[in-house]
């Protein structure tokens, strides 16, 4: 969708769960806008802060020394009010009150749904995919995934060390309520014996128990299970496995550490380009768009198109993850 109104003031907000690299996107958006002669404003605490008019002017200095920092300097929050027509109208009215005629929204599907509503109310919006879950269908990359999956991988390596020393079975629970990309990638990168994903919910716990017993018979000193939070129940699963196998079994829930930490080079670079690209789209007169990375290029899609498609698990990656497991070694 295009607009004929020239954008003069752009607001930037981060919404929903934080993701490493968000600061790189904020920095890029602010500096690109200032370079193009646009006034830049930061909206604190996402849509909730927008409702409460927590809006600040942003200068190039305000985003200095932020590219290497995890989290988001604009803070973030979830906002139930933004799901209501009254809340959406209030958000649009606040934008107009503060002269914000363009909005960069960094977040996931829920954040984009809010941006879509604001676009319908006359506020030019562009979404930037920021979520560690990698669950936005229109893009091959989302800000934060690379850092989160590396954080999880390094943690699982450490758990493996102690698991081997004590000849234990270890269940490591990673983030991914509805999408198992962190679990899948870590399962491959860490050489896990079993991977449990929300997309493959019909797993057979007895088969896992049988694998553990058989692998121990073959001399395997540890057994690593990477479990997505969408499956969950890692602690109770560990108790059942230990009772059935007689092998000490421990659960480790990585939790919010996956959201923190200094972003990787990949997250910094991709986020920087996406943040700048979002501003460029607004200045080109585009609205109701989402920035994406597809087939080696930075592109943009209509928000409605981005929200209408559910991302599917890459079956070949799943097949290879299972094929390379020790469970299938003869």
Describe each model-derived feature in a short phrase.
Residues 2-51:
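N-terminal phosphate-binding or glycine-rich loops at protein starts, especially the Walker A/P-loop
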Residues 2-3, 50-103, 110-111, 143-150, ...:
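Glycine-rich oxoanion-binding loops at beta->alpha junctions
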Residues 15-18, 43-49, 78-79, 108-110, ...:
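Short, ordered loop/turn segments at secondary-structure junctions
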Residues 18-29, 51, 85-89, 102-116, ...:
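Short glycine/serine/threonine-rich phosphate/pyrophosphate-binding segments
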Residues 105-107, 117, 124, 145-248, ...:
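Accessory alpha-helical/coil subdomains and C-terminal extensions
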Residues 247, 257-272, 279-283:
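Catalytic, metal-anchored helix/loop core of enzyme active sites in primary metabolism
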Residues 289-330:
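Phosphate-binding loop/pocket of nucleotide- and phosphate-handling active sites
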